[in-house]
């Protein structure tokens, strides 16, 4: 079924919404944990359920390489395969056009890209991307796009934009012919406002179920990220979900909500957890620091996650000191719980009309 989006309340530009999907309802704004290979690193589906995750992201390109479409179809899609009953959004593989650009070849047909697993060259087209995402059975499919790298010239950014539009048309036609999965179009345009405006006009003219802002948070300065987002958001329809691709820092999330964005994803909370960094309501914490050697308090006194209910800073520091994977797992649980709690508090603050106050509290500790 195609998604249904309800805009429940606004507080200035901040939006409180609800997305109805085949595998459940998603309350927005919300953060999506990233499960690239059909798992969120160091988390079981039960862990994700307990922290309150509503929807997760998986990556079509990586799942195409392993386990492959045959295995996914054998399991009737990713939900049965990984034992996750809630909604899933899949990245089309467009980001790999950016991240695996060494040796790639881009044509109107698609992208010839090197597999990070065995070095073989794979031709990814919009049609193949849709076929992969159909075999995955995701609730939300992303159109295949060209995510341009920072520093790209205006001339080259035009080429990337035109390919993104062409591939969006082909993605939409392809997925509509094979399934009733919902699909989001992606606005590109690099860091050029005239191209952002053109891309938004072209992509929103198509019958997508939602829209994403792509090509940002890829290494540019923070001010540029916000400037481009603030410029782009008003160009998107109010009656459809808005997804910013690649936002995981608490500061960025509250700033994007303030601009009218609904959905976010990033590996940041899980990646920093594996390196000993906790996200708390008083800012970041390096639990490997010597000052926590004898500290019997939880990571965050305000947190109700499994980790904070059961373990001390001292113990988690010890686990990292000895290289025990359990330390990474416990911090991953905590960080993702924090992101879900942040999302929930954002929703409550929009409902209650005090979002600016909450945003101010977050910005006080995350600069």
UniProtKB/Swiss-Prot annotation:
Catalyzes the base-exchange of a guanine (G) residue with the queuine precursor 7-aminomethyl-7-deazaguanine (PreQ1) at position 34 (anticodon wobble position) in tRNAs with GU(N) anticodons (tRNA-Asp, -Asn, -His and -Tyr). Catalysis occurs through a double-displacement mechanism. The nucleophile active site attacks the C1' of nucleotide 34 to detach the guanine base from the RNA, forming a covalent enzyme-RNA intermediate. The proton acceptor active site deprotonates the incoming PreQ1, allowing a nucleophilic attack on the C1' of the ribose to form the product. Belongs to the queuine tRNA-ribosyltransferase family. Its cofactor is Zn(2+). Substrate binds at residues 91-95, 145, 188, 215. Binds 1 zinc ion per subunit. This is Queuine tRNA-ribosyltransferase. InterPro entries: ArchSynthase1/Queuine_TRR (IPR050076), TGT (IPR004803), TGT-like_sf (IPR036511), tRNA_ribo_trans-like (IPR002616). It is an enzyme of class 2 (transferase). The keyword Transferase applies. The keyword Metal-binding applies. Pathway: tRNA modification; tRNA-queuosine biosynthesis. The active site is at residues 91, 265. One of its GO terms (cellular component) is cytosol.
